């Protein structure tokens, strides 16, 4: 070869199928990577459906306007892939969340997988955040407040031991602020004022313990939104990159603000980030 190394040959040998009832070893460092490789060809071909995979957590989202055929065919495709690759879907743990903002929506059709009906729930915890059917994020805020208050207790204990303010601040950033800001791009802009006040109360308590104000959650959210928007613009493989290109003015090169008919969309990530970048905070 050109590098001076002798050519190498490689051959793979596959054993026959072996059945075991001991289960797979848990806690292996390579397990998430190996499972990701194993499921790499599990893709969703439907145009109006989106499949999100994170290790062994898989979600399938369908955008339904008039017909559910595309969404249901995507579900059938996923079930078929699992059957072909010796993966068993646990239907009892599979949940469906229906997001419908109509005033009087008709009852949704049940989703059937291998003869079992998938339970429809009002909220579901996925990748650490609770998603509800109205996208109000109140249940998620409640969970955040509970976890943050548990950590504030330890801050109070450290303060009673006269720990230095610097260490208290480090403890806050590592254990409390990380909880308050986790996935904040998805939910913070859409929170009601009541929920924002509950989160703000935690930062005020932490500020008193530390001795100086901590970073306001609104400031943290805005800085994070602007940074993420720039990352998306530079990443041509990102699903939202084309959406931003369509919003870019051909004359000035600035991003054109999204037209929002509802406060729900106006306060979501993309419209908010574009307003911040353009310097038109509202």
Label each PLM-derived region with a short phrase.
Residues 67, 88-122:
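Short, conserved micro-motifs composed of acidic
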Residues 192-282:
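Short linear motifs embedded in intrinsically disordered, charge-biased segments
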Residues 23, 58-83, 101:
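Catalytic palm subdomain of template-directed nucleic-acid polymerases
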Residues 27, 39-42, 51, 56-58, ...:
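Mobile genetic element proteins and their domesticated derivatives, centered on retroelements
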């Amino acid at each position: 070869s050109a590098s001076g190394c002798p050519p190498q040959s490689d051959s793979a040998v596959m054993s026959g199928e072996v059945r075991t009832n001991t289960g797979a070893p848990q806690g292996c460092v390579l397990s998430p990577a190996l499972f990701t490789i194993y499921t790499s060809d599990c893709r969703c071909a439907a145009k109006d459906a989106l499949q999100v995979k994170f290790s062994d957590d898989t979600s399938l989202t369908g955008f339904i306007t008039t017909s559910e055929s595309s969404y249901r065919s995507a579900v059938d495709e996923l079930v078929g892939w699992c059957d072909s690759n010796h993966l068993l879907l646990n239907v009892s743990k599979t949940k469906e969340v229906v997001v419908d903002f109509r005033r009087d929506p008709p009852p949704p059709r049940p989703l059937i997988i291998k003869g079992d009906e998938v339970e429809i729930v009002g909220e579901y915890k996925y990748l650490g955040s609770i998603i509800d059917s109205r996208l109000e994020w109140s249940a998620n805020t409640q969970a955040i407040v509970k976890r943050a208050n548990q950590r504030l207790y330890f801050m109070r204990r450290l303060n009673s031991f006269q720990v230095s303010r610097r260490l208290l601040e480090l403890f806050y950033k590592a254990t409390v602020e990380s909880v308050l800001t986790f996935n904040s791009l998805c939910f913070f802009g859409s929170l009601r004022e009541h929920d924002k006040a509950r989160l703000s109360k935690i930062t005020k308590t932490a500020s008193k313990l530390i001795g100086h104000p901590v970073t306001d959650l609104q400031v943290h959210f805005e800085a994070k939104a602007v940074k993420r928007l720039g990352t998306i613009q530079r990443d041509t493989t990102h699903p939202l990159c084309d959406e931003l290109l369509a919003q870019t003015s051909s004359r000035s090169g600035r991003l054109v603000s999204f037209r929002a008919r509802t406060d729900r969309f106006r306060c979501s990530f993309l419209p908010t980030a574009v307003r911040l970048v353009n310097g038109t905070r509202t």
